[in-house]
Amino acid sequence: NLINHIPFIPISLFKSHRIIRTGGAESVVFESSGTTGMKSSKHFVEDEEIYRKSSLNYFQSIFKNVEEYTILALLPNYLQKGNSSLVYMVNEFMKCSKQTQKGFYLDDWRALENQLLDLEGRGQKTILFGVTYALIDFLTSFDTKLHNTTIIETGGMKGRKEEITKQAVYEILGRYIPAEKIYSEYGMTELLSQA
């Protein structure tokens, strides 16, 4: 049974030890967001292709062909920190997309708004990934309904705002996006999981 070959270790070891196969060398190191005020975890990944393929396969199991979508991202604290598995994943989706308009946004909401309006006007299928607090701030300052855009909120207020329930998040986002176009995506750096 292969499960017996997997060493089970506490998540806390990713904060204090270099966890990798004996003799292995990392091709990429992902770092957790560290939003709990604690030391960030580090995941030393020997074969980043495994993460790339698993993320893409999961994405396409839900949304089908990534090539058809314009991929945008509003992930300010992740971009500023660097080494984020979430940023890596979204960047890979952008590379796979056949659409020319794609990109990450920090705080240029006017440019993001203009791009979304252009894409909406053309009926282009669009996915906007965003950390919850940034999506709420952006959409509440942006008084237009989006019909061709899917929102994937990546969770949390990241210490920027008071935490609110998932239902409250969906109620706020639902004022701007149809409920069936709102998704949640959460990952755990230590497990290379994005779901």
Regions found by a protein language model. Name each.
Residues L86:
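Residue(s) in the substrate-gating loop at a strand-loop-helix junction
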Residues N1, E68-T70, E92-A195:
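Active-site glycine/GP-rich loop and adjacent strand/helix microenvironment
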Residues N1-E68, L72-A73, N77-L79, N83, ...:
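Nucleotide 5′-phosphate-binding alpha/beta core
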